[in-house]
């Protein structure tokens, strides 16, 4: 797994194998876990993802600057939706990416969530 924080666009870019995305989806569904990312010399590379169960409402995706990790926290129902989206990306047989962006009234993301781009383990754009 590779996590890069992009200060220019204010988003985090996540690239992972299908197995790593499935592990992340499971941690999100369970509401706990700490997954490491591949180390890199770049100052914008994050060390991993921590998942926490909180009362919500919604899922908050934020960056812990001190520990250089991405934190995903939220209530069970909202985490379940995010986990399903991550699993769908892990099992999709074509390429592409998934934008997870908060907007007012979003049904599972909490206000203040960082935009997250999840890249397909199969690369580029879909072949459909």
What feature does the model see in each segment?
Residues 1-128:
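Positively charged, low-complexity terminal tracts
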């Amino acid at each position: 797994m590779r996590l890069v924080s992009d200060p220019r666009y204010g988003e985090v870019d996540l690239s992972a194998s299908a197995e790593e995305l499935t592990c992340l989806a499971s941690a999100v569904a369970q509401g706990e876990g700490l997954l490491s990312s591949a180390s890199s010399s770049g100052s914008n590379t994050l060390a991993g993802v921590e998942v926490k169960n909180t009362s919500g409402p919604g899922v908050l995706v934020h960056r812990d600057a001190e520990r250089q990790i991405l934190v995903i926290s939220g209530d069970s129902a909202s985490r379940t939706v995010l986990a399903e989206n991550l699993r769908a990306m892990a099992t999709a047989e074509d390429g592409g990416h998934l934008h997870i962006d908060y907007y007012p009234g979003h049904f599972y993301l909490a206000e203040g969530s960082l935009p997250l781009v999840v890249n397909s383990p199969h690369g580029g754009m879909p072949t459909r």
